Amino acid sequence: MNEVLNCLLTRRSVKKYLPQPVEQEKLDAVLEAGTYAACGMGRQAGKIVVLQNPDDIAQLERMNAAIFGNPDAHPFYGAPVVCVVFADTNVNTWIEDGSLVIGNMLAAAHSLGVGSCWIHRARQEFELPEGKALMQKWGVGAQYAGVGHCILGYAAAEPAPAKPRKADLIIRA
């Protein structure tokens, strides 16, 4: 099977991570792949903030868990890297552009043997005063909104196999 297709068909969301860090070379490759995502009219609306400090990750995780409605949850599953993807809301394809950044990062991580998962609620996090303060601290302009998180690390357990695809996902008209 073609290497790219194999990567796309075998990638799974990892929801339990080892504490070992992701090597800088691999992390940089995943981030670069994100910057090469397709985007509307080449406007490159996405922006990636990379968190590796456990205290920073814990702060964001607490915010995410509260939005989720379960303050005791650990929605980042112990991942040692959390990448927050923002996009410039002045670009009319900002949601799509930011989503494709995450998609590229997920595929790139898998191709390098790094586990990953898309975590939602970024938009809500950065609409909060605490989130806006973080954006300011990180130098992310107010015109940006959170699209999602791409968590990265090495899987502590083998991800579940893919569910069979629904028969009606493709309609040939």
Regions found by a protein language model. Give the residues of each.
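Acidic, surface-exposed loops and disordered segments
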Residues: M1-A173
